[in-house]
Amino acid sequence: MTGLRWATQFCPSAKYILKCDLDTFINLPLLTRFLPIIKGKVRQFMIGHGHEKQLPPVLREGKWAVSDHLYPFDYFPPYLIGHSYAMTSDIVKHLLSVSDFIPLIPAEDAFITGVLARIIRVPRLHFDGFAHDNHVCLPCNIVYNEDITMTKMSLSRLLLLWRQISMDDCLAEELPLIRNQFSNDSVAIGDIFWYSRK
């Protein structure tokens, strides 16, 4: 929530807000072409990789544990995986105002893109090009604009990947090379689907 407050204070003219983990690479050239295309179809939205389960279970033990006094339900609303997701900036003030009345849940992605997003009724859109744990993303997928984000990367790999994007070239050993599916600034809306409208 602090990051969203910071963004509204220091980036008031931003059209989009991106949340990403420190070990996540963002293909900014592709993302900056991609988001306006979506906004042309959907005025307000969150987009990322939807949780694999339509009713994501609330974990009561482990790293992502949420106590039942904070969140007494067995399932979260559908939410976007927290490695990386983007949203139109005009929904942030609504998220912040609602968050003042809801106990903060330590699972940030479930809280912001699940609980709060459901309350303000913002569409959450799933796109496979955003990182998630079960997706094998090769560096060439980023370089040749198949994927927008890649996660669990070391600093040296992040720098190497940026150099490869800048040169529009990929290391030969990093197989499947499919050229730039977004180069004409269009995206098949069929590749993106409503994760949850509720």
List each language-model region with its residue ranges.
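Secretory-pathway lumenal glyco-enzymes, predominantly type II signal-anchor Golgi glycosyltransferases
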Residues: 1-198
